[in-house]
């Protein structure tokens, strides 16, 4: 009896971790100096020191909350009946499978350090992934009444309003984070003179406290339905007006972020919201729904025509055509530099003897004649097609006061530099950082579409083949940067991504599939399918009679927004904790509604 009374009593303190996740976590912005440890790789800078303002302390704060939630979750489960615990474990069986596979992936990780402590620009190591699962389970366990949902809704609105206030100001050209008084809050005084925050995005582009404009798109698509729910269902008029202003600020932030994924996801969510609203409020909703869909498409086309920020990028997704390139690939091997160029296969070799050097060039196995300039520093050869290609001899500084011979070739509008004097028996490519690395021609599932979606075609195309390699347990949490072919410099050039280090695949599903394995991706999707099944039954197939059903619908739409945006964005500590909270809250609301229907005798 005592335990039952404890469960019925609305404990506001139990909601505090969830309130902090939706209200405070996205706002945390504090300076942290990171040593990436990536300088051991030739494709990264020798200097491994970077500044982080948006990720590290968000992760620390979240992990502290996760520990608290785990303790409280164990306590809550201890008060439940055997039937309730059985229902809990069955509901979260896919989550347990996903987390188990994440643990196994960490055990087999290509780098334990990153999988346990986190990667620069990502910060989703194993402890954070476990925290996501704990968040969903905790939300499911402690949210039991409509009043508790309202207690969670208000901090969410406050958090959204703070995040979007910064965003709207950035949209108007005033970046609050660059102001001196804010700098003193987020950067320790001892290093303020030498280190300060400087935005890397153009003036007027919104990134707010979410690290990157892409995640503004995910944030808005996920929380816009929640803001709209607050407009209609908070009891106090002042709160409803405040929520309405916040919803407008969310849309302005989305517009300023120029996030194409966010635009598509938010539009999908809004159309689905209108569809569900019409179904509930209009008798012959099925006659109006097609018109709403047409209106949505018209708005999208209008946005593209008027060149709204980021909207023209959406059009590119549907109009993308395969591009052909003269330079197909470059491989540095022990037997020369292998080049596929305009349908021919070239092999370039350099012979060095003291201060003398010479070249041998093979085209499809046939040696070409070489001519040298009077100075001898430039060699030329003519292809069967009649095109002349020049090879220029240069000096490369191997060490202080130590120089060796290297050569550069202009191909398809770009100079490529090589040497066989840096690694015994091997040719190496000298990248834009001046570091000697192997140049590879990595498998690419989307060859010719590298520029699609702001060069996402490049990273997607080279990530897809990794799924077969890491099918079972993945490469390990936060190790994408280590297994992605960062040294396919020809593909980089085609994608206009020279020098860009990809720490994430810009796709939630590829991120999960590569890092923790395709099996874990299936478990991840199963986590949502469990929720989706109950939501479709609850929100599409019957009319709403209680506000909890409307709020549950908003939560459902929020999760849809996150997953749609995930087609072009990744999971990141700035937004993912809120998604997992919504997933747990949505499951809790479905449970509440099922209990109500059972009580009313409705099957």
Where in this protein do the model-derived segments appear?
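Alpha-helical transmembrane segments of multi-pass inner-membrane proteins
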Residues: 2-31, 58-75, 92-112, 125-401, ...
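Extracellular loop and loop/strand-boundary signature of outer-membrane beta-barrel proteins
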Residues: 122-125, 138, 448, 497-498
């Amino acid at each position: 009896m005592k335990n039952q009374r404890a469960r019925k009593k609305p404990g506001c303190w139990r909601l505090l971790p969830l309130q902090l996740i939706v209200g405070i976590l996205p706002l945390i912005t504090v300076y942290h100096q990171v040593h990436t440890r990536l300088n051991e790789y030739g494709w990264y800078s020798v200097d491994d020191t970077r500044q982080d303002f948006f990720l590290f302390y968000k992760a620390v704060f979240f992990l502290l909350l996760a520990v608290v939630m785990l303790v409280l979750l164990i306590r809550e489960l201890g008060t439940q009946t055997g039937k309730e615990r059985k229902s809990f474990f069955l509901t979260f069986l896919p989550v347990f499978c996903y987390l188990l596979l994440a643990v196994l992936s960490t055990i087999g990780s290509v780098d334990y350090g990153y999988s346990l402590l986190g990667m620069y620009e990502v910060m989703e190591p194993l402890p954070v992934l476990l925290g996501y699962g704990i968040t969903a389970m905790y939300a499911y366990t402690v949210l039991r009444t409509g009043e508790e949902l309202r207690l969670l809704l208000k901090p969410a609105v406050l958090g959204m309003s703070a995040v979007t206030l910064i965003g709207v100001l950035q949209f108007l050209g005033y970046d609050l984070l660059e102001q001196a008084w804010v700098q003193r809050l987020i950067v320790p005084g001892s290093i303020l003179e030498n280190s300060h925050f400087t935005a890397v995005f153009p003036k007027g582009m919104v990134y707010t406290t979410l690290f990157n404009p892409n995640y503004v798109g995910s944030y808005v698509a996920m929380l816009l339905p929640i803001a709209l729910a607050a407009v209609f269902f908070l009891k106090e008029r002042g709160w409803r007006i405040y929520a309405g202003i916040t919803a407008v600020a969310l849309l302005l932030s989305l517009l300023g972020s120029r996030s194409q994924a966010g635009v598509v996801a938010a539009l999908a969510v809004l159309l689905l919201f209108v569809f569900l609203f019409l179904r509930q409020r209009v008798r012959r909703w099925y006659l109006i729904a097609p018109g709403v869909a047409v209106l949505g498409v018209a708005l999208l086309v209008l946005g593209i025509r008027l060149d709204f920020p980021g909207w023209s990028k959406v059009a590119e997704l549907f109009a993308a055509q395969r591009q052909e390139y003269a330079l197909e690939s470059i491989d540095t091997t022990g037997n020369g530099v292998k080049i596929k160029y305009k349908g021919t296969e070239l092999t370039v070799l350099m012979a060095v003897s003291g201060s003398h050097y010479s070249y041998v060039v093979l085209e499809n196995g046939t040696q070409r004649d070489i001519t040298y300039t009077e100075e001898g520093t430039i060699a030329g050869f003519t292809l069967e097609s009649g095109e002349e290609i020049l090879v220029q001899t240069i000096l490369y500084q191997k060490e202080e006061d130590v120089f060796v011979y290297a050569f550069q070739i202009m191909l398809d509008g770009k100079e490529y530099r090589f040497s066989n004097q840096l690694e015994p028996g091997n040719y190496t490519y000298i990248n834009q950082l001046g570091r000697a690395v192997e140049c590879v021609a990595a498998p690419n599932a989307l060859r010719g579409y590298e520029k699609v979606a702001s060069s996402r075609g490049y990273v997607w195309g080279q990530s897809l083949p990794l799924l077969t390699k890491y099918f079972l347990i993945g490469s390990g949490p936060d190790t994408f940067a280590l297994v992605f072919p960062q040294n396919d410099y020809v593909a980089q050039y085609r994608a206009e991504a020279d020098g860009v280090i990809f720490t994430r695949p810009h796709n939630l599903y590829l991120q999960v599939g590569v890092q923790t394995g395709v099996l874990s991706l299936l478990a991840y999707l199963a986590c949502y399918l469990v929720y989706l099944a109950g939501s479709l039954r609850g929100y599409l197939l019957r009319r709403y009679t209680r506000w909890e059903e409307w709020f549950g619908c908003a939560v459902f739409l929020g999760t849809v927004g996150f997953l749609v945006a995930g087609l072009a964005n990744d999971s990141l500590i700035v937004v993912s904790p809120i998604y997992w909270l919504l997933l747990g809250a949505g499951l809790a609301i479905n449970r509440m509604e099922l209990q109500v229907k059972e009580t009313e005798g409705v099957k």
